[in-house]
Structure formats: structure tokens, C-alpha cells
């Protein structure tokens, strides 16, 4: 069925309350877009934080009376009577079928393949991760996920513990386990992400080696040999003290979700604790990695 999309631009401080207002006025879903860091907003592990210039996007049934919705929203104190908005008609497509048709097995590095659970694996002898993430979570098709998977493939993970900070579908944690890690920890704010990660881990036979935490329930004393966080440049900078504390001394850190022109500002947030490797780039995106400095 077709849909109507309503887009509002606001500050990070007001975005959550405006999202609630859209839901109260008929939206079937609300998403957030950080206008500067990434075209797709992913909530931070730990809490829902939004940054400076944020778009709030409501999705409505095509039969919705949008004039009535706008009239109701004009009564919201944070918006006022002449708030700036954009209404768009979305094409009627079978989005799930189109997504499934376009998701093919993909190779990352020398050993690793990410394969849709409904397709045959190209190389049975490779390290194959069978994935059925649903529409909401990562599949490996985005350059940032690809950069992270290639990095994991390049590491010797035998006997290691890996933390996937913002696990989504669980793709990175599961890949780490299939590549030899002994234990992986996935953290996410979204219960659906935790369930998707659990389902995918079970599908790949690694569930007993994966521990999953809703961010609010994450232990404060976690540490591991390898930490990977594929989120956004803004939260990577903001959460540097938290993320930087997770690797053990001598442990490895991988960060992505970063545009190439944002790399330097992210690096500056981590140079006090890490020796940073050369930046890896793909298209307009990049990955930052480094080794945690051992303290005396």
C-alpha cells in the first residue's frame, strides 16, 4: 500500500517530543535523521540521543487526512502555527520483496561471506554467516558495515572476546564468532535488535557464545580484546570515554559510520588512549582502528 511521509526539521533537544506528537496524531512509525552525520539515524546504545539539526519523519497511511494532522500539530507548543514541514507521497512497492530480491551473498576479505538465509552459499568451505536481519537492521550492503567486516576478517580472533557496540542484526558479533572469537557481546538500545541478533546467532549455531544486553542493562565493568562500533560520527565522539574504556590494554578498537571528512574529529576523541592506524576508506565513508595504549 502507498504511504505519506511527513518530515519536520528541529533541534536534537526537541526531536523526541515531536516524534511523540507525530505518533499521537496518527503516524504508524517515526524515525530520526541526523542531517549532518548520516542519511539514516541509528539510536545510540544506552539512550536515544539526537544531535543539532535533526529531521523527524512520520509515516502515515495513504488515506490519512494530512490537513487535519497539520492542524493538530500546530497546537503543539514546540512547533507553533507556521512550522516548516514537507509532505511526500511514497511509491507503492512491495518493499520486503524488493529488499529480498536485491540481497545477495557478499564476500568480505579473504574468508568471510555474508549470505541471505534463503539463498545457497557460494562457497561451502568459506566462513559463512547466514543472515535474515529483517528490514530494520544491517545486512553488510552499506560501506560502513563492509569496512567493519573486512577489518574483522583481517584479524586473528582465535580465543578473543569481541564487543559489538550497537549490534543491530548481530552481523558483526556473529561474524567475529564464526571467524574464531570465543565470546561476543552485543549491545543495543532496541529490543528488536536484540531479538534479531539472537535469531541470527541461533541460525548460525553460535548463540551459546553470544551475550546480548539492552543498553540500560549493560554491566559497567565490561572489557574485551576487540571492540567494534558502527554507529555515527557524532555519538562516536560523544561516547569516546565509554567506548574507549571497553578494550583491554593492548586491545583493538574499530569505529565506523563515519564520513571521510569527519575522520579527523573522531580520531581526536580517541588519540589519548589509542595508537591510531591509517584510516581505511570506501566511497565517502571510512573506518578508524587502533590499539589501546597499555598503562603502567
Curated annotation (Swiss-Prot):
Catalytic activity line of the entry: L-lysyl-[protein] + 3 S-adenosyl-L-methionine = N(6),N(6),N(6)-trimethyl-L-lysyl-[protein] + 3 S-adenosyl-L-homocysteine + 3 H(+)
InterPro entries xref list: Ribosomal_L11_MeTrfase_PrmA, Ribosomal_PrmA_MeTrfase, SAM-dependent_MTases_sf
GO BP of this protein: methylation
GO CC aspect terms: cytosol
Domain of life: Bacteria
Localization per Swiss-Prot or TrEMBL: Cytoplasm
Keywords, comma-separated and alphabetical: Cytoplasm, Methyltransferase, S-adenosyl-L-methionine, Transferase
Binding site for S-adenosyl-L-methionine: 145, 166, 188, 230
Keyword Methyltransferase attached: yes
EC id: 2.1.1.-
Main subcellular location: cytoplasm
Molecular function in Gene Ontology: protein-lysine N-methyltransferase activity
Stated family: Belongs to the methyltransferase superfamily. PrmA family.
Function: Methylates ribosomal protein L11.
Protein name (Swiss-Prot/TrEMBL): Ribosomal protein L11 methyltransferase
Organism of derivation: Photorhabdus laumondii subsp. laumondii (strain DSM 15139 / CIP 105565 / TT01) (Photorhabdus luminescens subsp. laumondii)
